[in-house]
Amino acid sequence: MATTHPRLPHDTTRPPACSWRGLLVDSARTFWPVPTMELLLTVMARYRFNVLHWHLTDNTGWRMRVPGYPMLTAIGGNIPRQPSDWYDTECAPGRKGSWRLTPAHSTQGFYSDANIRHLVNFAAARNIRIVPEISIPSHAGAAIHAYPHLGNPALVNEAPHGGNQTLWPSAASLSFMEAAFHHACSLFPSPTIHIGGASTDWGPWESDLSLMRAGLTSGAAIERLFIDRALRTLHFHGRRAAAWDSLTRAYPTPPPGTTLLAHRPGNAGRRAAESSGAPWILADADILTLSHPGRTNSPLEPAHTLFDDLTQALRGERLKGVEAVAWSASVTTPDLLFYHLLPRLLVVAEAAWHGEDSLPWDKLAPLVEQEMAHLRRTIPYWNPQRP
């Protein structure tokens, strides 16, 4: 990327309003090669983001090696993209059906230990720390597809996009989970590791008589079994956890040292985080999910709407920062990724640094337009006029 002085945030001689200025990048659903990750980090650094939340595991992809579990990447790293028309409602205008044309390799691959260490160092040189996410106990479908005994024993023959996506409370699953977090701690120096904690369907656990007879009498208790073991592993390495706000279903008061990401829509995530007593990050799905395109003919209108909503939302006790979110279920190529991120990521940068002292929109909009002119010359950016 050509070096020019960034216009946003508008005054970085002031201290930042948010200590956590993050972007979630989803490499589980679409595998982003190392050069794409480098370019993302370069863009983040330009606008003073300091946390890359790296979503590395989910139902449709497992992207990091775990010693002793070679099938994680051999099988879990090569799950075909789900052929479903629901993508069409999520894609940018004019990209209907684009998932059908996406190259097969977009869901194939994993990051070697050397790749990860390189990107950690690349990020650190730009004042960014990488916070990896290993999703437990739900959103584990890729791991279960590779090792079916980790999931529900009644669903061992389910397809990878089927319902067997939650770790089963067994010695094998707990050992696997520990191995994954031990290895993550060896690769990522971040003091915080994200453990997932997204909403888990407790029904299969609670309806299993053998689990009930073993004394595992509620979904909340079983989820705590997984989370407590993960935290014990992190604490062994001197780390602490971040988790989605859904963790409060099992822990109304989260374990000490845990940071929550308030993500559930309709203010549910915010309410859970605010009432938890834990420090929290605003990652509101209604405001900050940039992989949902703004449905408008004006390129700046979605950025304007986001800016108005965000500057009002960045208030609250124990609020430590803000995180934009880019899921990759329907974002399948680098040009489409940057199309979704920009220009809205620029207004997140301004609000994250300046908070209530952000420029008013009439002064901010020209700077956004100038930055976009620069970015379109230097990064892959989908042109809606030439789909």
Q: Can you annotate each of these PLM segments?
A:
Residues 39, 111-118, 172-179, 222-229, ...:
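Generic recognition of stable, solvent-exposed alpha-helical segments in well-folded globular domains
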Residues 143-257, 264-277:
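Active-site neighborhood of glycoside hydrolase catalytic domains
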Residues 241-258, 263-387:
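Flexible, acidic glycine-rich loops studded with aromatic residues
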